[in-house]
């Protein structure tokens, strides 16, 4: 994919304001709450029985940060997201057997959390660039499935 200098600037500027340990847990908890069938991949996380349990779960919070660290890897490798995500794609497809449709659900939840966090700064233009970035990221993460 080709990124214009404006798109690169938008992605890196937005991402530069993100604190993975703050945003990640909220976005990942939202996935588990809004799409409860995704909980099946996290049976070892303990109590995921309700919103309070999920929101207060240390393993959910830790994994949310890990997920955002993965997004950070894509931001730092805009010119080769597919290459940067090869091992993550293999892990999710071959070892964890995660349904790749769940990556879009996570992207949607992350977008909602970012829009909530940044309010008026998360303009339609910023969102359009962010969505383009997520499409590339999700495609790279889903690559080993096909």
UniProtKB/Swiss-Prot annotation:
PROSITE patterns: GLOBIN. Involved in oxygen transport from gills to the various peripheral tissues. This is Hemoglobin cathodic subunit beta. Pfam families: Globin. Keywords: Heme, Iron, Metal-binding, Oxygen transport, Transport. The keyword Protease does not apply. GO terms for cellular component: blood microparticle; haptoglobin-hemoglobin complex; hemoglobin complex. It comes from Gymnothorax unicolor (Brown moray). Residues 2-146 form the Globin domain. Heme b binds at residues 63, 92. Gene3D superfamilies: Globins. One of its GO terms (molecular function) is oxygen binding. This fish has two hemoglobins: cathodic and anodic. Cathodic Hb has high oxygen affinity, low cooperativity and displays a small reverse Bohr effect. Anodic Hb has low oxygen affinity and cooperativity and displays a normal Bohr effect. Heterotetramer of two alpha chains and two beta chains. Red blood cells. InterPro entries: Globin, Globin-like_sf, Globin/Proto, Hemoglobin_b, Hemoglobin_oxygen_transport. GO terms for biological process: hydrogen peroxide catabolic process. Belongs to the globin family. It comes from the Eukaryota.
